[in-house]
Design a protein with these regions (language model features):
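Short acidic, hydrophobic short linear motifs in intrinsically disordered regions
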Residues: 33-42
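Short amphipathic alpha-helical interaction segments
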Residues: 44-58
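Minor-groove-contacting beta-hairpin "wing" of winged helix-turn-helix DNA-binding domains
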Residues: 68-75
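Short alpha-helical segments that sit at the start of domains
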Residues: 1-24
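Amphipathic alpha-helical dimerization/coiled-coil segments
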Residues: 77-100
Length: 100
């Protein structure tokens, strides 16, 4: 598309953000407790983006902030079990839209 912002840009950004959140959860589970600097190094993500994702994940109750660093909460396992199903629902919905 030429000129202006594509109406799809925000969708792509949200999908990218969701992927970052999921990656951050996986690394946190594997290396917990883990701090912002280490998460930034491991994931290759700027610290400000790590802080943002941690804030969102904490708000959703998926991680817990401790003095030693972030740790996953009891909700982690259930959330990760639901990820494939939720992604499949998105794919089905996108396929439906593309056929209309």
């Amino acid at each position: 598309m030429t000129g202006g912002v594509s109406i799809f840009d925000s969708v792509f950004e949200e999908i990218e953000l969701m992927g970052r959140h999921i990656d951050m959860l996986k690394v946190t589970k594997e290396m917990q407790p883990i701090g912002i600097i280490r998460l930034s190094e491991v994931l290759g993500i700027p610290k400000h983006k790590v802080r943002y994702s941690l804030r969102i994940l904490e708000k959703e109750g998926l991680i817990i902030a401790t003095n030693e660093g972030a740790m996953v909460s009891d909700k982690y396992e259930q959330f990760m079990r639901e990820v494939p199903e939720k992604l499949e629902e998105l794919i089905v919905h996108i396929n439906k839209i593309s056929k209309e």
